[in-house]
C-alpha cells in the first residue's frame, strides 16, 4: 500500500502570476490617468502642517485683540459636505475639480478652537487648506453686556472687517440679509449676509456672513449656500440608503458571527492561531485611536465636566479596541472551523507547507497587483457611468481629520487593515463558504453572488446618486474577490482589499505640498510592500547558502524492516522491535524522500480496530499530515477486517480530543474510574494541585500527539 501526496496544494502557474502583475501595473496607471476625472476633491492641496495652522489661526485672533492664554486648544480638518455634494452633482466631478482648483471655494477648512471647560465663551478660526482666512467665531453668553449701535454703524464695521481681513470687494457682492436682535444682557447683535454676483453653480450661492456682537465682530463666515430643495432631497435619499445599508450590514455581522459560532461548536478548533491576527487588528486600531486623541477636544461640549469627558472617551476606546479584537478572533477561528466542512485538508486563508513564507509573500504580491486592478475599475466605473448615465459618487480620497492627527498614516493603516480582514473573513470566507456547505458544493456562482450583493449594499451609506450606484459598483468587486478567493486564498483578497483602502486614503497625503504629509504618504506606500519581505528574505537565504531542496511529494506506505533504525531514532517512547513483530499490528510511515517524518500505528483485536499512536515531525506539522495518517490507517484497519475503529484518549488530553473532533470523530464509549467515595477539602485540593503539576504525555503513549492537523 503506497499513497503519494503533494506537500502543498497551491502550485501557482507562472503565466497567471505574470498576467496578474501586468494587469496590476496597468491598473495603477489607469487610476492615475483618470484620478482627476473620476474622484471629487482631487484638486485639494493641503499646504499647512498642524503646527502652521495653529500659528496662523492664533495670530488672526491676536490681531483682533484677543488673549488666548489659559485656553485649551483643539485643531481639526473638515469639510462642508453638503456644499461639496451639491456642486459635484450640479457641475459634474471634472468641472467641480477644475473650478475648485481655480476659484478656491470654501469647501475644506482647518477649524482651530480655543475653549475653557464649563465656560461658554470660546473662539474658533477657520482657515483654507492653503492658510487663507475663511472666518472666525467668538461665542459669547447671551447675557454678556455690550454696545447698542445702529444697524448702519454695524454694517460699516462688518464691511470694514471683510475688506481688511478677507479681500472683500463691495462691487461684486450683493447684500441679501440684514437683521438685528437684542440679547438678554442688553447687547444688540446685527447679522448681515452678501452673495457673490460672479458665482454660478445651479441655484447655489457663494456667501459672506458676519455678525456684529455689540460693536465687535463675533462671527464671520465664507460658505456656499445650498438650495433647500437639494437639502430635503438629499436627506430623503440618505434615509432610504441608510435603511438599506443597516439591513445589509446587520445581516452580514449577525450572519457571519452565527456561522462562525456554529462552526466552532461543531469543530472545536485550536484557537491559538487566531490570537496574533486579532492582536494585530486591535493594536492598529488602538494606535489609530490614540493618534486621534488631539481631535477629541474639538467635540468637547463646554457644559460637560472635562474629566468625565476624557473618562468616557477612554472607555469608548477600550471597548472599541476590545470589540475589534474579539470580532476578529471569533471570525478567524470560525473560518478555520468552517474549512473542515467545506475545504478539508486545505487552509484557504494561506497555503500550508515548507514554502509557507514564500507563499505568504506570493499571495501578498498577487493581492497588491489585484488592488491596482480595483483602483482602475473604480476610476473607470465612475468616469463612464457619470458620462453615460449621469451617475455620481464622491468616491473620493480622504480629505478629513487625517491631516489634523500627529501621525496621519495611522488613519490609513486602520482604514485598510481592520476593514479588509474583518470584511474578507465575514463575506468571502464565512459567507461564501457557508453557502458552498449549504449547497453541497454546487451552485458556486450563487455562493459567490449572494455575499457579494450583501457586502455591496452594506456600503450604500456612502453618498451616491442614484443611491444604488455604490451597490452596483461593489457587486462587481465582490464577484471579482469571490473568484480570486476560490482560485487562490483569502490572504490574496485581504491584501487586495487592504491595498485599495490604503491607496484611496493615503493618496491625499502624497498629493499635499506639505513635506510631512508627503512623507506620511510614502509610509503608507511602504506599508503596502511589507508583506513581501518574508518571501524576499527566504529567497536571499536560499541564494546565499545551500539548502536541501524542498520535498514536493510525500508518501505514506507500510512499515518495512529497513525502517526500524529510523523509527527508533524518533522521539517516541516505545519499543519498535516488539511492535513491529506483532502480527495484528499495522504501522504506516510518512516518508519525505528517504526520511521518515511521521508514523501511525494501530492493531486489530477481533473485529475492533484500535489506533494507539500517531506522530509527525515538527517540521511537517500543521500541514494535514496527521489527518492523512489517521485517515489511511483507519482505511487500512477496515481493510484488514475491522468493523469499527477506536482511539483511546485520556481526560486530560484536550488537544488530542480537539484534533479528533476536528476529524469528525465522536465520543463512543465513556470509561469511568472511581477514586474515593468521599474526599475531604484538603484531599481534593491536593489532588487538584497534583493534576495541575502532572507532566503532559509525550508524543507517543497511547494518545494522539498535539498540534497535528
Q: Where are the regions a protein language model picked out?
A:
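Core alpha-helical transmembrane segments of integral membrane proteins
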Residues: 237-411, 415, 423-426, 436
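Acetyl-CoA-dependent GNAT
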Residues: 568-612, 630
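Exposed beta-strand-loop-beta-strand "reactive/processing" segments of non-cytosolic proteins
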Residues: 7-14, 31-36, 63-129, 174-214
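Conserved acetyl-CoA-binding loop-helix of GNAT-fold acetyltransferases
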Residues: 616, 622-635, 662
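Transmembrane helix-loop-helix hairpins at the membrane interface
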Residues: 379, 392-548
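Conserved active-site alpha-helix within GNAT-family acetyltransferase domains
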Residues: 627, 651-669
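Conserved GNAT acetyl-CoA-binding A-motif
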Residues: 637-649
Amino acid at each position: 500500500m503506497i499513497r503519494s501526496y503533494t506537500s502543498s496544494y497551491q502550485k501557482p502557474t507562472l503565466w497567471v502570476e505574470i498576467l496578474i502583475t501586468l494587469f496590476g501595473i496597468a491598473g495603477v496607471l489607469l487610476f492615475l490617468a483618470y484620478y482627476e476625472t473620476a474622484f471629487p476633491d482631487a484638486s485639494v492641496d493641503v499646504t499647512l502642517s498642524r503646527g502652521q495652522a495653529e500659528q496662523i489661526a492664533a495670530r488672526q485672533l491676536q490681531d483682533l485683540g484677543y488673549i488666548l492664554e489659559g485656553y485649551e486648544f483643539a485643531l481639526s480638518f473638515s469639510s462642508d459636505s453638503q456644499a461639496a455634494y451639491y456642486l459635484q452633482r450640479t457641475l459634474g466631478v471634472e468641472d467641480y475639480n477644475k473650478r475648485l482648483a481655480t476659484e478656491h471655494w470654501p469647501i475644506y477648512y482647518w477649524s482651530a478652537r480655543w475653549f475653557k471647560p464649563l465656560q461658554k465663551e470660546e473662539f474658533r478660526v477657520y482657515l483654507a487648506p492653503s492658510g487663507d482666512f475663511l472666518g472666525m467665531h467668538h461665542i459669547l453668553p447671551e447675557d454678556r453686556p455690550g454696545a447698542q449701535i445702529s444697524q448702519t454703524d454695524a454694517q460699516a464695521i462688518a464691511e470694514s472687517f471683510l475688506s481688511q481681513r478677507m479681500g472683500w470687494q463691495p462691487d461684486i457682492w450683493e447684500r441679501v440679509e440684514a437683521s438685528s436682535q437684542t440679547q438678554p444682557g442688553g447687547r444688540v447683535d446685527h447679522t448681515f449676509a452678501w452673495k457673490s454676483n460672479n458665482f454660478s453653480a445651479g441655484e447655489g450661492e457663494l456667501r459672506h456672513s458676519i455678525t456684529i456682537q455689540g460693536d465687535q465682530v463675533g462671527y464671520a463666515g465664507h460658505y456656499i449656500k445650498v438650495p433647500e430643495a437639494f437639502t430635503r432631497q438629499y436627506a430623503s435619499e440618505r434615509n432610504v440608503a441608510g435603511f438599506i445599508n443597516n439591513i445589509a450590514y446587520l445581516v452580514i455581522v449577525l450572519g457571519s458571527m452565527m456561522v462562525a459560532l456554529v462552526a466552532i461548536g461543531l469543530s472545536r478548533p485550536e484557537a491559538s492561531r487566531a490570537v496574533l491576527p486579532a492582536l494585530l487588528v486591535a493594536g492598529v486600531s488602538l494606535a489609530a485611536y490614540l493618534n486621534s486623541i488631539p481631535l477629541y477636544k474639538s467635540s468637547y461640549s463646554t457644559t460637560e465636566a472635562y474629566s468625565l469627558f476624557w473618562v468616557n472617551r477612554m472607555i469608548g476606546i477600550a471597548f472599541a479596541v476590545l470589540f475589534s479584537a474579539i470580532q476578529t478572533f471569533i471570525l478567524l477561528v470560525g473560518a478555520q472551523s468552517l474549512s473542515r466542512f467545506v475545504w478539508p485538508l486545505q487552509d484557504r486563508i494561506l497555503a500550508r507547507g515548507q514554502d509557507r513564507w514564500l507563499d505568504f509573500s506570493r499571495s501578498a504580491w498577487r493581492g497588491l497587483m489585484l488592488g491596482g486592478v480595483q483602483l482602475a475599475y473604480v476610476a473607470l466605473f465612475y468616469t463612464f457611468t457619470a458620462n453615460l448615465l449621469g451617475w455620481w459618487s464622491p468616491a473620493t480620497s480622504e480629505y478629513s481629520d487625517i491631516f489634523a492627527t500627529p501621525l496621519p498614516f495611522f488613519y490609513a493603516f486602520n482604514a485598510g487593515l481592520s476593514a479588509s480582514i474583518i470584511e474578507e473573513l465575514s463575506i468571502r470566507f464565512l459567507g461564501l463558504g457557508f453557502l458552498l456547505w449549504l449547497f453541497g458544493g454546487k451552485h458556486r456562482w450563487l455562493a459567490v453572488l449572494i455575499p457579494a450583493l450583501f457586502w455591496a449594499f452594506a456600503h450604500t451609506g456612502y453618498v451616491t446618486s442614484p443611491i444604488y450606484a455604490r451597490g452596483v459598483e461593489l457587486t462587481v468587486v465582490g464577484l471579482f474577490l469571490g473568484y480570486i478567493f476560490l482560485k487562490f486564498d483569502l490572504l490574496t483578497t485581504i491584501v487586495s482589499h487592504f491595498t485599495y483602502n490604503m491607496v484611496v486614503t493615503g493618496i491625499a497625503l502624497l498629493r499635499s505640498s506639505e513635506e510631512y504629509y508627503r512623507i506620511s504618504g510614502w509610509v503608507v506606500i511602504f506599508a503596502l510592500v511589507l508583506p513581501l519581505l518574508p518571501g524576499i528574505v527566504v529567497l536571499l537565504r536560499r541564494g546565499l547558502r545551500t539548502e536541501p531542496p524542498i520535498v514536493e511529494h510525500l508518501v505514506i506506505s507500510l512499515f518495512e524492516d529497513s525502517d526500524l533504525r529510523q523509527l527508533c531514532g524518533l522521539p517516541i517512547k516505545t519499543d519498535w522491535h516488539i511492535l513491529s513483530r506483532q502480527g495484528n499490528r499495522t504501522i504506516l510511515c510518512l516518508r519525505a524522500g528517504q526520511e521518515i517524518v511521521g508514523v501511525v500505528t494501530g492493531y486489530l483485536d477481533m473485529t475492533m480496530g484500535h489506533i494507539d499512536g500517531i506522530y509527525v515531525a515538527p517540521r511537517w506539522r500543521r500541514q494535514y499530515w496527521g489527518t492523512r495518517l489517521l485517515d489511511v490507517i483507519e482505511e487500512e484497519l477496515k481493510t484488514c477486517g475491522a468493523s469499527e475503529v477506536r482511539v483511546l484518549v485520556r481526560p486530560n488530553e484536550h488537544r488530542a480530543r480537539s484534533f479528533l473532533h476536528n476529524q469528525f470523530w465522536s465520543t463512543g464509549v465513556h470509561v469511568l474510574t472511581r477514586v474515593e467515595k468521599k474526599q475531604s477539602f484538603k484531599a481534593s485540593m491536593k489532588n487538584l494541585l497534583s493534576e495541575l503539576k502532572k507532566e503532559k504525555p509525550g508524543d507517543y503513549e497511547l494518545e494522539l500527539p498535539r498540534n497535528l492537523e
